[in-house]
C-alpha cells in the first residue's frame, strides 16, 4: 500500500524522542529520574519538534535488568512515580499534540511477576504452561552439569535454563535467570498480554515499542544449537524470527 504524506499513519512520519526515565530528569532530588521530571521538560521537547515520546520501561520491577524485568505490567515503579503521574504525563503530551509510546517487554516477565510465582508453585499449576518448563536431559539428573534441556547460551551468561530445585525442572530464560520466558504457544498467555495492552490503550497510551519481540516464537522441539565456544551452543536459529512470530503479531494487531 502506498501512502501520501497527508494520509500516512502518524508512526511512519513522526519525530520520536526516546526517554530513559532513570537518567533523564530528577524532580525530587533522590538521584533517580522520574515521571514528574519528564513532565517538567515537555515544553523543551515540544520546542524541539518532537511528535512522539518513547518512554523506556517504568513498570513495577525488581530492576534486575533496568526495568526490562517486569513484575506488574499495570503499575508504575515507585522509583518513577505513580499511575496518576503517568496519567498527567499522557494528558500533558496530548494537550501539546504529542503522543506517548511505551516500551513493552512480553517475551519474558520478572520471576517475581504473579504469573511466574503461580507457575512455579506446582507442576500442576494452571499457569505451569505459561512458561517454558522442561525436565533434565534423558538419562541425567537435574542439576548435573550438562543436564539442561538444551545447550543454548543466555544473552547474559551461562545457560538459558535455570533449575527449580523444588520441582526438579528447568525454566527457560533467554536473558537473566530472573527473566523467565513466556510461552507464546499458550493462547491464554497471548490473551493476557492482549488484555494488558488494551488496558494501557484505554488509559490513553498511543502505542508500544515491543522489546525483543522477534524472539517470542520458539521451535517447540527445543533442539540444541551449534557449539561456538566452550560448552554452550548458539540457540538463536531456534528462537529468532521463529515460525509463528508474524502470526502472533497479526493476532496482536487484530486484538
Q: For the regions a protein language model found, what residue spans apply to each?
A:
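A glycine-centered loop/beta-turn motif at secondary-structure junctions
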Residues: 203-207
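Acidic/aromatic-lined carbohydrate-recognition and catalytic surfaces
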Residues: 2-198, 202, 215-255
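Hydrophobic residues within beta-strands of alpha/beta enzymes
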Residues: 53, 208-210
Amino acid at each position: 500500500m502506498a501512502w501520501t504524506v497527508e494520509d500516512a499513519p502518524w508512526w511512519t512520519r513522526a519525530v520520536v524522542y526516546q526517554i530513559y526515565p532513570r537518567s533523564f530528569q530528577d524532580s525530587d532530588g533522590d538521584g533517580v529520574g522520574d515521571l514528574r521530571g519528564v513532565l517538567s521538560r515537555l515544553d523543551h521537547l515540544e520546542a524541539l519538534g518532537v511528535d512522539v515520546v518513547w518512554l523506556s520501561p517504568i513498570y513495577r520491577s525488581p530492576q534486575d535488568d533496568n526495568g526490562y524485568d517486569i513484575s506488574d505490567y499495570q503499575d508504575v515503579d515507585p522509583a518513577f512515580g505513580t499511575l496518576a503521574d503517568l496519567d498527567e504525563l499522557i494528558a500533558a503530551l496530548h494537550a501539546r499534540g504529542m503522543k506517548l509510546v511505551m516500551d513493552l517487554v512480553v517475551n519474558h516477565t520478572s520471576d517475581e511477576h504473579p504469573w511466574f510465582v503461580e507457575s512455579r508453585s506446582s507442576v500442576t499449576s494452571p499457569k505451569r504452561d505459561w512458561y517454558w518448563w522442561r525436565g533434565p536431559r534423558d538419562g541425567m539428573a537435574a542439576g548435573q552439569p550438562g543436564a539442561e534441556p538444551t545447550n543454548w547460551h543466555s544473552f547474559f551468561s551461562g545457560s538459558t535454563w535455570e533449575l527449580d530445585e523444588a520441582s526438579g525442572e528447568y525454566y527457560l530464560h533467554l536473558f537473566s535467570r530472573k527473566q523467565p520466558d513466556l510461552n507464546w504457544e499458550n493462547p491464554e498467555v497471548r490473551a493476557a498480554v492482549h488484555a494488558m495492552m488494551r488496558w494501557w490503550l484505554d488509559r490513553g497510551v498511543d502505542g508500544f515499542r515491543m522489546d525483543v519481540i522477534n524472539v517470542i516464537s520458539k521451535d517447540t522441539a527445543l533442539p540444541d544449537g551449534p557449539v561456538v565456544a566452550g560448552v554452550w551452543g548458539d540457540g538463536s536459529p531456534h528462537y529468532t524470527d521463529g515460525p509463528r512470530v508474524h502470526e502472533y503479531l497479526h493476532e496482536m494487531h487484530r486484538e
